[in-house]
């Protein structure tokens, strides 16, 4: 039997704070790190989990920790598995644009995010989707938007009434990402 690897989870008080205890418990061995201040160790990591939060409120701290952003990009480029939800997905993008400027992020995903006031649009509600024949549920809550092209979704996402919504869940390299916060981690990671 193969060695069980640990899950590395980004967590702090605001920029990566949308975590469900049931999700954390489902991982087995976990290690937490703060992308604003820590340098993560990827030794024996089987999955990097970047949950949601408000990275757009802490951009200067995230940009200042360049070694963390580079380590995450290197991990992704070397085939490391990543699951990123909302703020975590934003952190993996090329940049986040605000009214104060453009801030480089990890550069793993080939997209940029706008958090500009002029681009604000509330996306809110319960979501459900199918991945590899299994239904997953979650919620969506954000004001930010993709700049330019939106990723092509690998499955249709629905609201609580069963109506299709435009929120993509997508893959890039070994990354599974979406604005949707899922209540359980997909088996297909």
Q: Which role does the model predict for each range below?
A:
Residues 1-9, 14, 113-189:
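Amide-donor transfer/coupling interface in amidating biosynthetic enzymes
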Residues 1-70, 74, 97, 113-121, ...:
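N-terminal beta1-alpha1 cap of cysteine-dependent amidohydrolase-like domains
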Residues 4-5, 44-45, 78-79, 102-104, ...:
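Short coil/turn connectors at secondary-structure junctions
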Residues 24, 59, 69-76, 93, ...:
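Generic hydrophobic alpha-helical scaffold/packing signal
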Residues 31-33, 84-85, 178:
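General beta-strand structural signal in soluble alpha/beta enzymes
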Residues 103-111, 116:
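Acidic, Ser/Thr-rich peripheral helices and adjacent loops at domain boundaries
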């Amino acid at each position: 039997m193969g060695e069980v690897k640990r899950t590395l989870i980004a967590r702090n008080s605001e920029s990566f704070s949308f975590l469900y205890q049931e999700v954390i418990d489902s991982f087995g061995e976990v290690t937490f790190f703060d992308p604003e201040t820590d340098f993560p160790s990827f030794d024996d990591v089987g999955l990097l989990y970047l949950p949601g939060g408000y990275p757009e409120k802490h951009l200067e701290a995230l940009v200042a920790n360049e070694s963390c952003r580079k380590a995450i990009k290197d991990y992704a480029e070397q085939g490391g598995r990543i699951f990123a939800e909302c703020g975590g997905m934003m952190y993996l993008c090329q940049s986040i644009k605000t009214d104060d400027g453009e801030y480089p992020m990890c550069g793993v995903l080939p997209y940029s995010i706008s958090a500009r006031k002029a681009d604000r649009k509330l996306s809110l509600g319960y979501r459900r989707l199918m991945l590899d024949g299994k239904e997953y549920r979650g919620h969506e809550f954000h004001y930010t938007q993709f700049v330019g092209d939106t990723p092509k979704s690998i499955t249709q996402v629905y609201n609580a009434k069963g109506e299709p919504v435009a929120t993509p869940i997508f893959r890039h390299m070994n990354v599974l990402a979406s604005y949707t916060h899922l209540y359980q981690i997909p088996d297909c990671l």
